[in-house]
Amino acid sequence: MVLSYDGPSVSSAGVSNVACSGSVSLTVVGRGGAGTSGFSGKVRVGATACAGSVWRSDSGVVCRSSSGGITDGAVSVSSGLQHGSVSRAVSYNAPVVSSVGPSNCASSGGLSLTVVGRGGTGWSDISAAASVGVTGCAASVWRSDSGVVCRSSGGIGGGAAVSVSSGVQRGSVSAAVSYDAPSVSSAGASNVASSGAMSVSVCGRGMGVSGPSAVGRVGGSACASSVWRSDSGLVCRAVAGRGRDHGVLASAGVQRGSVSGAVSYNAPSVSSAGASNVASSGGLSVSVVGWGGMGVSGSSAGGRLGLTACEGSGWVSDSAVVCKAPGGVFGGAVGVVSAGVQRGSASL
């Protein structure tokens, strides 16, 4: 006849939540099989053995939990070759984040952020990881069950959440960190052709971390293209325009910075007119030619002969306007072309 002793049977653990730092007493209760003396078996929470186990009776053992970070972990009791368990009995506390300091960091990253909470941030350097927004920190250093130091990655934007994960659990605090907004100190070219297509180096800081993260503007117009160079500079290819003392703006995400009065488009310059003699009755088309600055579209430039505006002005290019001469009696008139508030002239 073969005789077998009942294996351990586990029905419950005394507490369902424990600190991830461990050292919480769990009363493991079952229906026998835990032995008859000081207890030779082991108790485990999840895959980790308890730091210590004290036998109370054939149906009860007190276990001092080890550190951990699981959720819905099984509790098992082994006695000899036999064991029993109950599933989903114990969870370690999830991280709780209460504050982050400092609240501003450079868009280039590299700043140490102290993430403070109320427990649940793990039990060793490898147990907790922090994120700012959707980007993981470049490095996370565990300090205690309630604190982690995070070295921020580069980023843009304001009001980013900070989260700490420990195992499969995580906690976060919203709107905790903002990256510095762009700041523009100067533009590399103070004058650009009204036809555009000129590269303007925009210098400052806080312009993001990659090619598509920053965009430049000259006046009210976005640059034809913006090429990120560093956290402190981008190159903007100016679009066609007119006028003077335009501000230059750089935006990174929803944040922006600008400098005023940085760029002017070249004023019109007039060198010659296509007809040197015009009937006093007017009506003759005169081609007014120059070296640029005459605007960017059909309505951007206007012509004058003498003191009288042309009856009609047709824009041809950045360097030419066709003026329908007004009637008049004058000699050696001055031809004037205006584009916005700027103008150029020549004696014809």
Residue ranges of each PLM-predicted region?
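Ser/Thr/Pro-rich low-complexity tracts
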Residues: 1-348
